[in-house]
């Protein structure tokens, strides 16, 4: 059973990684056509549609924690398990649900609203370089919000195998950032982006490092409790 769990998780992780191919094509080929005036800038062309492969990657990683696999002692499925310390489990789940809500609706809404100022009509060719709002803190706030939201969801469900493979999802998102930078931002904004990159961290500022430390603490505590009750 554990072997099957690993296989299913790895297969989905590979599928999500392969979704980078249309994403790469969208920026590599699509932007070349933009530069040669051979492609309209509307959101209806096939290259813009390929951009949405990034959303399928995200969905796959929301599905993976639900699959059958070993789980941490504290998780939402064991909320009413009498063998689990109820008070700690309730508090654990409340905290993670709050974190999901924050990164999905508070952080996410701010970033999306800010992002749409430049990408509403054309995803592959932003109308301007966004450097204010959340983008003043880090250059990739949308990616960071997505990563922390997925991590919260994985921990809420106590999905151990998905957590072990989470590094793959991080690598996928770093690849997405590299693709966007190389074929879009660095092409259209050049000096402006170079100056922006000098003064703004790509992924982590002090606030996000505090979140990362908090998540690490949660993982360590839950790992300890899980091994304690084996």
Place the predicted regions along the sequence by residue.
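Membrane-anchoring alpha-helices and their flanking helix-loop junctions
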Residues: 1-131, 148-188, 194-230
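Helix-capping/helix-break motifs at membrane-protein junctions
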Residues: 139, 189-190
């Amino acid at each position: 059973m554990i072997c099957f769990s690993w296989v299913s998780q790895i297969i989905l992780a590979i599928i999500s990684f392969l979704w980078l191919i249309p994403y790469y094509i969208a920026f590599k080929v699509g932007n070349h056509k933009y530069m040669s005036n051979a492609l309209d800038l509307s959101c209806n062309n096939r290259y813009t549609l390929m951009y949405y492969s990034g959303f399928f990657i995200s969905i796959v990683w929301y599905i993976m924690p639900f699959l059958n696999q070993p789980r941490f002692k504290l998780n939402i499925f064991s909320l009413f398990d009498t063998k689990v310390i109820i008070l700690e489990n309730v508090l654990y789940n409340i905290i993670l649900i709050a974190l999901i809500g924050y990164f999905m609706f508070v952080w996410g809404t701010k970033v999306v609203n800010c992002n749409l100022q430049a990408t509403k009509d054309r995803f592959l060719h932003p109308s301007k370089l966004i450097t204010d709002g959340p983008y003043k803190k880090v250059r990739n706030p949308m990616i960071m919000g997505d990563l922390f939201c997925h991590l919260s969801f994985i921990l809420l469900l106590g999905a151990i195998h998905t957590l072990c493979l989470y590094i793959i999802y991080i690598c996928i998102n770093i690849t997405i950032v590299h693709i966007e930078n190389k074929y879009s931002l660095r092409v259209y904004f050049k000096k402006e982006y170079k100056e922006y990159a000098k003064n703004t961290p790509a992924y982590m500022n002090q606030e996000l490092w505090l979140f990362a430390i908090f998540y690490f603490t949660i993982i360590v505590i839950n790992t300890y409790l899980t091994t304690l009750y084996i």
